[in-house]
Structures are given as structure tokens and as C-alpha cells.
């Protein structure tokens, strides 16, 4: 019955029923008897569950890594770094001074090798410079 390139139109009865459907719904919507289709709460529940999962992950990470984040690990050298002033003294031998090493009680001794007398007197030794 159908020929190539020829399409039959729907019958007027079918066509008229589809045209009248929106007109029939319009008075129901205006009168308030028309109900909106029910929407399930799946998107809202999904968002709430996702927020709680992210919160749980944050709490687990904070509890697991928290103590390590608050502790600073600093490695201090046992000796101070060697100062390198231009034309100055390089202090490379450090030792802890005791009560017998106080500068007031230090006996006058020979000059440190390599020290030359300055115009205002002998230069202090490395031990004396360290005490200062």
C-alpha cells in the first residue's frame, strides 16, 4: 500500500485526539487538580551521602597524618657553622668552656703562633675570642 516516497498522514481521529490532549490538561492545571509528577529524593540523598563520605575521609586523613603534621623535624648541627669573614679569623676548633676557662682567671701565656703584636698590644688568642 505504501509507495516509495509517499507517506500517509494519520487519520483525523488520531490527529484530533493528540491536539485536544493539551487543551484538556490546561483547565486541570488552572483549577489545581493537576498533580506534579512525583520526584524521588535520589539526587538529594546522593549529595548528602557524598558530603558525609568526604567528611569521613577528611577526618581519617587528619587523625592518621595529624600528629606528623604538628611535629617539626629539625636537625641541628653539633657545632655552629664556620663563619667565613673576609680577612678574618676562621674558628674551626670548638670546645665547651668550663669554669676553669673564665677570662678573668686565665693566666697570661705565650702568644698564639701566627699572631703578631698589634700596635695597641698583642692580639687575643682564639680561646679568648671564643669567650668574648
Swiss-Prot record:
Record's keyword terms, sorted: Glycoprotein, Membrane, Transmembrane, Transmembrane helix
Cellular-component GO terms for this entry: membrane
Protein source organism: Homo sapiens
Top-level division of the source organism's lineage: Eukaryota
Transmembrane keyword on record: yes
Compartments it resides in: Membrane
Start and end residues of each stretch annotated as Disordered: 1-28, 99-132
Membrane topology (UniProt): Single-pass membrane protein
Lineage: Eukaryota, Metazoa, Chordata, Craniata, Vertebrata
Gene: SMIM33
Protein name: Small integral membrane protein 33
Record carries keyword Transmembrane helix: yes
Amino acid at each position: 500500500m505504501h509507495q516509495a516516497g509517499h507517506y500517509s498522514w494519520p487519520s483525523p481521529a488520531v490527529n484530533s485526539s493528540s491536539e485536544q490532549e493539551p487543551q484538556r490538561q490546561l483547565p486541570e492545571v488552572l483549577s489545581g487538580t493537576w498533580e506534579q509528577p512525583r520526584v524521588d529524593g535520589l539526587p538529594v540523598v546522593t549529595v548528602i551521602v557524598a558530603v558525609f563520605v568526604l567528611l569521613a575521609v577528611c577526618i581519617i586523613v587528619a587523625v592518621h597524618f595529624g600528629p606528623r603534621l604538628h611535629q617539626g623535624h629539625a636537625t641541628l648541627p653539633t657545632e655552629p657553622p664556620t663563619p667565613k669573614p673576609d680577612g678574618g679569623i676562621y674558628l674551626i676548633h670548638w670546645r665547651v668552656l668550663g669554669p676553669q676557662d673564665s677570662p678573668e682567671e686565665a693566666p697570661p701565656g705565650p702568644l698564639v703562633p701566627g699572631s703578631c703584636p698589634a700596635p695597641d698590644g698583642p692580639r687575643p688568642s682564639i680561646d679568648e675570642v671564643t669567650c668574648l
